């Protein structure tokens, strides 16, 4: 017999939404500052346009390749690992002296932006069935908030 997972408190549900917002926003912070990044690296619009394009392509690839792991492994563990992967991409972008390394870091960041898609599955096992729709809505709002705030 397996032990019942601990139920989430209302505060924990909202903190998961904040986490979803933060990890989602990481993939979108480049958009409002793309001109500044292009000037910093001394490149034109065509070259800098690859950065968000590859980030989003890597996100799609991450959804295709990494998200199914949530069916076999702990969503909590995967969320932690993928968030660490995001941090690695962010560190690479921060330390990049050239556009190539910056682009690789951004691509890794996109690839590991899977946590927002794992959090609803994690939460669904830890809330009462009658609260599932409400909690899913809170987490979805966190993802949308992250996308919108990152673009400001």
Which residues does each PLM region occupy?
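Extracytoplasmic
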Residues: 15-45, 63, 116
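Conserved MFS/SLC helix-loop-helix module at the cytosolic interface between two early adjacent transmembrane helices
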Residues: 61-97
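Residue-level signature of mid-helix packing/kink "hotspots" within the transmembrane helices
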Residues: 28, 56-64, 114, 147-148
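Juxtamembrane helix-start elements in MFS-like secondary transporters
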Residues: 44-52, 136
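Cytoplasmic helix-loop-helix junction between adjacent transmembrane helices
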Residues: 105-141
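Glycine/proline-centered helix-kink
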Residues: 31, 63, 138, 143, ...
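Structural signature of transmembrane alpha-helices in multi-pass secondary transporters
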Residues: 23-24, 52-55, 59, 86, ...
């Amino acid at each position: 017999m397996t032990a019942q997972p601990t139920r989430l408190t209302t505060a924990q549900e909202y903190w998961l939404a904040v986490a979803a917002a933060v990890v989602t926003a990481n993939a979108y912070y480049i958009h409002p500052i793309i001109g500044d990044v292009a000037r910093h690296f001394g490149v034109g619009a065509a070259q800098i346009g690859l950065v968000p394009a590859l980030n989003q392509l890597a996100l799609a690839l991450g959804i295709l390749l990494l998200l199914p792991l949530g069916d076999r492994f702990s969503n909590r563990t995967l969320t932690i690992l993928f968030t660490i992967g995001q941090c690695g991409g962010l560190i690479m972008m921060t330390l990049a002296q050239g556009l190539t390394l910056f682009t690789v870091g951004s691509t890794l960041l996109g690839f590991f932006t899977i946590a927002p898609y794992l959090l609803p599955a994690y939460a669904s096992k830890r809330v009462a069935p009658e609260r599932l729709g409400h909690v899913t809505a809170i987490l979805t709002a966190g993802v949308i908030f992250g996308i919108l705030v990152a673009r400001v």
